[in-house]
UniProtKB/Swiss-Prot annotation:
It catalyses: ATP + H2O = ADP + phosphate + H(+). This is Pre-mRNA-splicing ATP-dependent RNA helicase PRP28. It comes from Gibberella zeae (strain ATCC MYA-4620 / CBS 123657 / FGSC 9075 / NRRL 31084 / PH-1) (Wheat head blight fungus). It is found in: Cytoplasm; Nucleus. Keywords: ATP-binding, Cytoplasm, Helicase, Hydrolase, mRNA processing, mRNA splicing, Nucleotide-binding, Nucleus. PANTHER family: ATP-DEPENDENT RNA HELICASE DBP3. The gene is PRP28. The keyword Hydrolase applies. One of its GO terms (biological process) is RNA splicing.
Length: 721
């Protein structure tokens, strides 16, 4: 019966449909199929492993059969007897090859030790050959038979970029290449008792005496003389070694060396010890003591009479530079002894000038010292008279607050040194009461404060009024001490200008660039930082009443004795705080800008004499005012900027003595909190309170407002105080 196409198509379609439908397989069926599949895979693995094992055995048998045919022919034994050659014409190729192998075997047999090792040795040789061939094919030829790997030696990775500074003794190639290392011997001769590095240790002399004693005992005739020679050689060698060590700067501290033995390394250590940093060309080394200062003996006697034992860091660095007639910029923390640092070289300078007489006394002073405040001027005048008086020099101060006629009267006999504030000095020059025709020595003390108080224009006019005939050239000659110390066609000398400041704002730098010639710059410590002798304490106390109560607790604690200075920000608070302090049982005076000059002098004199216990002041007293032995400074109001704060707390801890500064902070002081935290963190004896450390305003430097920047640029600081 023929196949029906339609039937076939129908069956195919039904089969495809059934195949497309998901088919449910019972669990037992699935487990059976999985077991059959696993068994099939296992059988395949066993079959493949068996085939590989059989193949390996066949190859091994083949190698063994090939290897066993050689030793029987090459072990030196006799050949199997054969018939005549004519009966052996039917030898196959294998027998011919065997004869050829026999000839090679005889040659190889000559190198073998004997017949007893024949079969075993040849079988091992075949295996070795096979292993060698396999190794050579897959691993390459053997080049280095001995490994130099050391587990102790650090291995560097190819990706490791860090340089290895370690050194291993095995890396020393000099012993292989330099024959000198092969002939090392222990050198022992008379006088060689030094230790490692040629230095004589504590036991060197004892070893020398033992050796001398041993030689004296062994040689009864000449031993004693030889022993004495050994000891003489030892002492001579030790002295030379010590001198050599001293010259290298390794033997003594700089304080124990003479000036001639000081090396560059010693001067570097000396400067680090005192926090001295210098900048400029041809700067001399600092002085270590007053005796090495090159000051005249009569000045040294005055220094001794005044009671200056050891020079301060600014005096050590600035005096040698100033004695070479160099222009100088001194950047030093407040209370560092700057006054004597510029007064002593000034007196040496004018000592070489002709004395004032009836003719030249009307040409003005030889030296001019400018300071920002009246109190600082009078303080410098008092200090200058201590040194200038015994030398016969006159010192006159010119400040506001006094009658100008009185100051003109003081100048009638002339003066070698004039100390003045810029405002009153310019007034005297414009009124023709004073000329500067022969002024050749100019000092600006607290130059940054003068600019803050608005004296920039006055300072420029005063400096422009100086004679130009003795002005220094702005060349390398300004750094040459010999040229600068020459006289200019008679009695004139090059003008010397010095500037002392605690900070270097741009306006001060502009004045220095205009009027100073190639100045040497001396920095003591870090500019703008407080001295390390002041312990700074900060307390968060807001509100006037709470601050007065806290001030009373501090004063009544008994930890601080008079004199004490309390700083406030505005003038009207001075009298109020002073009145409260008086109610606490303390005597108090005030000092601010509304006081007359007589009142200012009376207030300072009362505190210095010990008649008054507490001085309440504005920032007027924050700069340069020297009240001896101030034990405590209280910032009743935090200063408006960190520079004023630095100079406020600098009223204590002066002249090497210690002091305490306590500051009351409030929410209104957020602009200074960051700088205050920085200056506290740099102090070795002060701690940053946790509240200030975590305060939001202390985390980043504040952005100054436009109005404040304008005021600072105009030079109008706190002049109203």
């Amino acid at each position: 019966m023929p196949l029906d196409i339609e039937e076939l198509l129908r069956k195919k379609k039904a089969a495809d449909t059934a195949a497309a439908k998901p088919r449910f397989i019972p669990k037992a069926e699935r487990e059976r199929l999985a077991a059959e599949k696993a068994k099939k895979e296992e059988d395949d693995k066993k079959r493949k492993a068996s085939e590989e094992e059989q193949k390996r055995k066949e190859e091994e048998q083949k190698w063994r059969s090939n290897g066993s045919s050689r030793p029987n022919e090459s072990n030196g034994s006799g050949r199997v007897p054969t018939g005549p050659r004519s009966m052996n014409d039917g030898r196959d190729d294998r027998e011919r090859d065997r004869d050829r192998d026999q000839g090679r075997g005889r040659v190889r047999g000559k190198d073998r030790k004997g017949d007893k090792q024949g079969v075993g040795a040849d079988k091992q040789s075949a295996e070795d050959i096979e292993a060698t061939l396999l190794r050579s094919r897959y691993l390459g030829p053997q080049v280095n038979q001995q490994s130099n790997f050391s587990a102790k030696k650090k291995r560097m990775r190819t990706t490791e970029k860090k340089f290895n500074f370690e050194w291993d003794a095995d890396e020393d190639t000099s012993r292989d290449n330099d024959p000198l290392y092969d002939r090392q011997t222990a050198v022992s001769h008379n006088g060689s008792f030094a230790g490692i590095g040629g230095e004589f240790d504590d036991g060197a002399e004892e070893r020398a005496r033992k050796r001398a004693k041993m030689i004296a005992q062994r040689d009864p005739e000449n031993g004693k003389e030889r022993a004495e020679g050994i000891m003489e050689d030892f002492f001579r060698a030790r002295d030379k070694a010590r001198q050599r060590a001293d010259r290298r700067g390794l033997g003594k501290h700089w304080s124990e060396k003479s000036l001639d033995d000081m090396r560059e390394r010693d001067w570097r250590i000396f400067k680090e010890d005192f926090g001295i940093a210098t900048k400029g060309g041809m700067i001399p080394n600092p002085m270590r003591s007053w005796q090495e200062s090159n000051l005249p003996q009569r000045l040294l006697n005055i220094v001794d009479d005044v009671g200056y034992k050891d020079p301060s860091p600014i005096q050590r660095a600035a005096i040698p530079i100033a004695l070479q007639a160099r222009d100088l910029i001194g950047v030093a923390v407040t209370g560092s002894g700057k006054t004597a640092a510029f007064l002593l070289p000034l007196l040496v300078y004018i000592s070489d000038l002709p004395p004032l007489d009836e003719i030249n006394k009307h040409d003005g002073p030889y030296a001019l010292i400018m300071a920002p405040t009246r109190e600082l001027v009078q303080q410098i005048e008092t200090e200058a008279r201590k040194f200038a008086g015994p030398l016969g020099f006159r010192v006159v101060s010119i400040v506001g607050g006094h009658q100008i006629e009185e100051q003109a009267y003081n100048l009638r006999d002339g003066a070698e040194i004039v100390v003045a504030t810029p405002g009153r000095l310019l007034d005297c020059i414009e009124r023709r009461l004073l000329v500067l025709s022969q002024c050749c020595y100019v000092i600006m003390d607290e130059a940054d404060r003068m600019i803050d108080l608005g004296f920039e224009e006055s300072v420029n006019k005063i400096l422009d009024a100086l004679p130009v005939t003795n002005e220094k050239p702005d060349t390398d000659e300004a750094e040459n001490a010999q040229i600068m110390q020459r006289y200019l066609g008679g009695r004139d000398r090059y003008r010397q200008t010095m500037m002392y400041t605690a900070t270097m704002p741009p306006l001060v730098e502009r004045i220095a660039k205009k009027y100073l010639r190639r100045p040497a710059i001396v920095t003591i410590g870090n500019a703008g930082e407080a001295v390390d002798t002041v312990e700074q304490r900060v307390e968060f106390v807001s509100g006037e009443d709470r601050r007065k109560k806290r001030l009373q607790e501090i004063l009544s604690s008994g930890n601080f004795g008079p004199p004490i200075i309390v700083f406030v920000n505005i003038k009207r608070n001075c009298d109020a705080v002073a009145r409260d302090i008086k109610q606490m049982g303390w005597s108090a005076v005030t000092l601010h800008g509304s006081k007359t000059q007589e009142q200012r002098e009376a207030a300072l004199g009362s505190v210095r004499a010990g008649h008054t216990q507490v001085l309440v002041a504005t920032d007027l007293a924050g700069r340069g005012i020297d009240v001896p032995d101030v034990s405590l400074v209280v910032n009743f109001n935090m200063a408006t900027n960190i520079e004023s704060y630095t100079h406020r707390i600098g009223r204590t801890g002066r002249a090497g003595k210690s002091g305490v500064a306590i500051t009351f902070l409030g929410p209104e002081d957020h602009e200074t909190m960051y700088d205050l935290k920085q200056i506290l963190s740099k102090s070795s004896i002060s701690k940053v309170p946790e509240e200030l450390r975590r305060h939001e305003a202390a985390q980043s430097k504040p952005v100054r407002g436009a109005k404040k920047d304008k005021d600072e640029g105009s030079g109008k600081g706190n002049w109203q105080h």
